[in-house]
Amino acid sequence: MDMASQTSALYMRTHLIGASGGLQLARLVAGDPWTAGAIDHLPAELEEEMAFVRERVEELSGHRESWLGAVVGLGSGVRGVAGVLRVTRGRFRRVAALEAMRSLLLAKKAMWELGMEGRVDFGPGTARCAELNDQAARQATELQALHQRAADEAFS
């Protein structure tokens, strides 16, 4: 694997690690009755995006990235701890959880932007980066609306 491919694969792996925690948080927040189904679609979208990135990492590295499954497993542990702490229950916890999710989504959006610019090697999937960038913008807007509502409730 050449240096450019190594760099792209490492960058994408880093995003996958963050995405695994983000996916678990998204499942918790989407499962909160307070959201009234507004982001029920988010976990499935995140899973699909992660599969797309993982596939490209495997193409670049030339081997199966089996360790990524373990990272997602760790994310499940994070979900368990977060569930015990009830990160989506309580006015301020909900605000903080939504802020964390939105931050992760904006980091992911930056990855898609770099892919669109050709700085990160998505190969034949480069064209899909624009679609995923638009999807990330929509997801962030949805979370912003929930965050605003949560903040109104928390600080009123």
Give short role names for the model-derived ranges.
Residues T7-H15, P33-E55, A97-A100, G125-A136:
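Alpha-helical scaffold segments that form or flank carboxylate-/histidine-based iron centers
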Residues L104-S156:
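Preference for long, well-ordered alpha-helical segments
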Residues A26, P33, V53, L60, ...:
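Hydrophobic stripe of amphipathic alpha-helices that form coiled-coil interfaces
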